């Protein structure tokens, strides 16, 4: 009982002390501000609960005169503070200071000598124009400095002296026009540098060499057109780099090869037109690759992504012109799990592309104009366990009979095993005006089974095969045509032709040089009959092909009193010989060639020719053949009739089913009519590019009355 008064006095003393501290705390907290304990993450991402004074968005004109002594985080964002005066009352434990969105115009107006424990300083969206020498040297413990979205145009070489513990530096969205490697001499421990969205003219070799511990570099939105080969030398610990939203026209593969520990690469939103062979190769630690939102990207070529043993994900989405991925584009990627190819212009994806990725688990190819034919049959043949992402958004665009259907619902047996080449319409423009002396490239790619061969035809009719190199032209093995030093003589129509054993496709581009075509020379057109047989005529022609459109059309008309038959084909302008077949013996034909020009004029010429008559031995041979053929057909029909009769008599079979079978059998020819004629005939009868044609017409003038 004697201890009871003592206990009461102790408890009363504690209560009074707590009350006094609470009153002091309330008195110390600046007017209108909020003072409380809040969660906070240090620059090292360590969680802590910090004493926070929140004075954001209060319209303050000056720095608070008095703060609680235990303040660790001070938030002064969105005020009108223009200067921080020296004070002896700065909290000694202040580690975070946010002065974003104020009126600070000079770092010299920020007196921070009494804040040695600061770890993070935010000066975003102020009016700072320069960083003079040693301007923040008192902040020896500073780890984060945000000066983005200011008006910085000048940074002195020694501006960051004293900040040897700095880990993160944000300088993006200022007015810097160059990067000085001397800035970084005082920052040996810097891990993250963001310097994008500045009007930097160029990056120089060794620009970042002092940053030996840098792990992340963001150089986004500064209109870079190239990266020097040695620009990234010295960044041995760099793991992530972003060149987002620049003007790179090709992958800076030489510079990237020198970042040996790179894991994440962002090249999104650059006008790169091709991912070429070796662009991403032998990058042993790369895990993720981003090539999204590239407005000019057309193709990913053979072995473009090769020997990346740790790569897990490729994102190549929202590229409006990406229409071709080579079957061997992705090679030696043993750990690739995710392939994102949605929202491009892909009509197909080769099975070989998928087969080369042994660990692939998911693929996204929806929102592409898929052509449901031979190339994508594999998707529905149950030959893969890969998960298709958003399969309900995967639709056929061609052919017409499958248009609008879900790709995964079209049975693979309904798709042909081989198919015509298709050159993507996005490959290159139909018309282009260039300046004399300029350099241009046209990227022609086509999908088909079997894989097509690609070549080009010049306005002069010259045929340029892959790997052809001349003074003016170079055709890459993938189908790209380079024209060097364009002159008015190189103006005219250039045609890319993709062909395989099924047929061909072509796409042309009309080039004007300084807004005009080559001068019209009113060239002539000559026709020559080179060979005449009973059932064929070999015709050749010679024209001033400089002014020809680079496609031709041949039409043969056969007239009798009661019949009219026509055959047609269109072939490249480099072909000046054509064999008219399936003609009648001893028949006079009128063969006409009609050539439209780039000046919308026509060259037309006709010749008359009579096919040879049949030799008596040939007549007898044909007669015997006809008799034999009729006998075979009669026998075949007899066998079919017996089968039908047996089918009708059988109680287990339906007679109507037999009739249906015969009817279907007779309606389906056992061979394609296209096999009787050159492959281009059926292709061009559909009327594609009818305006760019050369017509060869053969019309019957006299038909013999006695063929025996």
Swiss-Prot record:
Sites where a glycan is attached: 93, 103, 223, 382, 522, 579, 608, 624-625
Q: Name one GO biological process term.
A: positive regulation of synapse assembly
- What is this protein's record name? Leucine-rich repeat neuronal protein 3
Regions that span the bilayer:
629-649
The question of whether Glycoprotein is a record keyword is answered with yes
Q: Which UniProt keywords apply?
A: Disulfide bond, Glycoprotein, Immunoglobulin domain, Leucine-rich repeat, Membrane, Repeat, Signal, Transmembrane, Transmembrane helix
The LRR repeat boundaries are 70-91, 93-114, 117-138, 141-162, 165-186, 189-210, 213-234, 237-258, 261-282, 285-304, 310-332, 335-358
The record's listing under PROSITE patterns reads: FN3 (PS50853), IG_LIKE (PS50835), LRR (PS51450)
Q: Which cysteines are joined by disulfide bonds?
A: 444-496
Instruction: Name all LRRNT domain ranges.
Output: 23-69
- Where does the protein principally reside? membrane
- Where the record annotates domain Fibronectin type-III, the positions are 523-617
Gene3D superfamilies given for it?
Immunoglobulins, Ribonuclease Inhibitor
Localization, UniProt = Membrane
